[in-house]
């Protein structure tokens, strides 16, 4: 009799085809190992007894031996997954990523399709912070799609660990604080977090920041770690003025210098400001009293603070 040592990822069918050259060899394994059943999960290091020189297909056995192949297909979940909640977010990852994770807190329920052969993961949200990580169990040819199904409201949502190349928010979601660091993608769907008041996008690389204009409840925004092109940052800053719409005042942190000089812009014949640069937009935001009544606008640019003060000489 021979002894076969199990390696990680092997199931009973792998052992049968490796030893006998056909899955029908399972019968001999069950006869020689009284403790064994078809429902058993084999573990690395387990040993099974088999009949020496009993081979159903010698060519298959010889092929594995010649090429040094040990079959280890594991147990795969190949059946359809059923989800009970609305599909809210889809993320796409490069197929070179071997794992992903994120943190979340809030109240409600979350169901995750990790885009591999694993079963759906269900996470109840009870108000405590939850950190979840996942190791993908199979490769994909193109981009890997991860789908998040959920209901409820979120206090904090950090997607940094996904390293997404694409982000699609398909339904409005109640989120208070959102974080996504060091991503290279479009943020066109962020307005689907209409109530968010704290956003950290440090290290974000994107061509357009104007989708952030839709976040009128925003009170804190961090865009550190990236030097944006002046037209990109200017378009956002100018939009904060031209599309103010009674939005909340906000603290915005940047590591890039907007165009122009921090000064009062020229006015047209109707007495309206004609904003010619990003710094002029900041001047208007930090000097318009009606826009600073509740809390002041504040801009931190490379450590220099521009902020509304009742004493106009202290506005820088």
Language-model segment annotations:
Residues 1-111, 118-203, 207-224, 235, ...:
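Cell-surface/extracellular proteins and modules involved
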Residues 228-237, 265-267, 271-273:
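Leucine-rich repeat
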Residues 290:
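A SAM-dependent methyltransferase catalytic signature shared across enzymes that methylate proteins
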Residues 224-227, 253-259:
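Short, loop-centered acidic/histidine patches that primarily coordinate divalent metals
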Residues 255-277:
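Short, flexible/disordered intra-domain loops and linkers
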Residues 227, 242-243:
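C-terminal low-complexity, glycine/proline- and small-hydrophobic-enriched intrinsically disordered tails
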């Amino acid at each position: 009799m021979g002894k076969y040592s199990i390696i990680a990822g092997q199931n009973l069918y792998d052992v049968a085809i490796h030893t006998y050259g056909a899955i029908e060899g399972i019968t001999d394994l069950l006869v020689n190992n009284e403790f064994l059943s078809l429902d058993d999960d084999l573990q690395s290091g387990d040993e099974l007894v088999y009949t020496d020189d009993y081979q159903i297909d010698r060519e298959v056995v010889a092929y594995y031996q010649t090429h040094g192949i040990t079959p280890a297909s594991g147990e795969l979940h190949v059946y359809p997954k059923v989800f009970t909640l609305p599909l809210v977010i889809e993320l796409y990852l490069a197929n070179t990523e071997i794992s992903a994770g994120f943190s979340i807190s809030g109240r409600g329920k979350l169901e995750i399709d990790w885009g591999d052969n694993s079963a759906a993961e269900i996470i109840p949200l009870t108000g405590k912070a939850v950190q979840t990580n996942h190791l993908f169990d199979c490769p994909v040819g193109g981009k890997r799609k991860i789908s998040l199904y959920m209901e409820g409201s979120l206090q904090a949502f950090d997607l940094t660990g996904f390293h997404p190349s694409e982000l699609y928010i398909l339904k409005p979601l109640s989120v208070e604080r959102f974080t996504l660091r060091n991503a290279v993608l479009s943020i066109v769907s962020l307005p689907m977090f209409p109530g968010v008041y704290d956003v950290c996008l440090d290290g974000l690389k994107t061509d357009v920041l104007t989708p952030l204009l839709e976040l009128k409840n925003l009170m804190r925004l961090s865009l550190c770690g990236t030097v944006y092109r002046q037209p990109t940052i200017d378009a956002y800053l100018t939009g904060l003025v031209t599309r103010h719409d009674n939005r909340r005042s906000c603290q915005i942190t940047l590591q890039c210098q907007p165009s122009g000089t921090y000064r009062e812009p020229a006015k047209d014949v109707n007495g309206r400001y004609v904003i010619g640069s990003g710094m002029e937009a900041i001047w208007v935001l930090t000097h318009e009293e009606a826009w600073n009544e509740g809390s002041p606008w504040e801009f931190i640019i490379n450590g220099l603070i521009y902020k509304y003060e009742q004493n106009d000489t202290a506005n820088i």
